[in-house]
Regions:
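Extracellular adhesion/carbohydrate-recognition regions
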Residues: 3-85, 133-137, 142-145
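Alpha-helix initiation/capping motif
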Residues: 1-5, 72-74, 97-100, 126
Length: 154
């Protein structure tokens, strides 16, 4: 066995440090654990899917309820609130488009939010192309109802 010099140790140390730095830059695989959840669905309701928080953790499950009503933005929001439900927000509208394209192809619908630039307008989702834009709140569009199921940890 030959003698080991300080220079050899420093060289190997530098090489090993470079390997560690390269390893740390590699993408890391992660696991997402879906805990058992029982989601009660009323008659005619359909589960659209999960909505996640910015950190990737589960926020809630979106449920599309049966029945709809056409009307102005305010009328649609009153209709859904009167049922104890919500008008879908912009993010939820995109999930509905992905989960139920056949349902969404039936016509444009109001979304929950007023347009931030002009209170006479609100966001809607056009299902011919699936894009979201603003429309005068007085225009009659579809109103669909959703609810948000938040699994509890007991």
């Amino acid at each position: 066995m030959s003698d080991v010099t300080l220079e050899q140790l420093k060289s190997e140390h530098a090489r090993f440090g470079a390997l560690l730095a390269q390893f740390e830059k590699q993408p890391v695989t992660t696991e997402y654990v879906i805990e058992r959840a029982v989601i009660p669905l009323p008659a005619g309701a359909r589960l659209a899917g999960p909505i996640f928080k910015d950190d990737g953790s589960l926020d809630y499950y979106l449920i599309l309820h049966a029945g709809e009503e056409s009307g102005s933005h305010d009328a649609v929001k009153a209709y859904t609130a009167g049922r104890g439900l919500k008008t879908p927000n912009r993010r939820e509208g995109r999930l509905l488009q992905a989960a139920f394209p056949e349902f969404c192809a039936e016509g444009s619908m109001w979304l929950e939010e007023e347009h931030e630039d002009d209170s006479a307008y609100a966001w809607y989702q056009n299902y011919g192309g699936g894009y979201q834009s603003r429309y005068l709140k007085s225009v009659e569009l579809r109103g669909v109802a959703v609810s948000r199921f938040i699994p509890s940890v007991i």
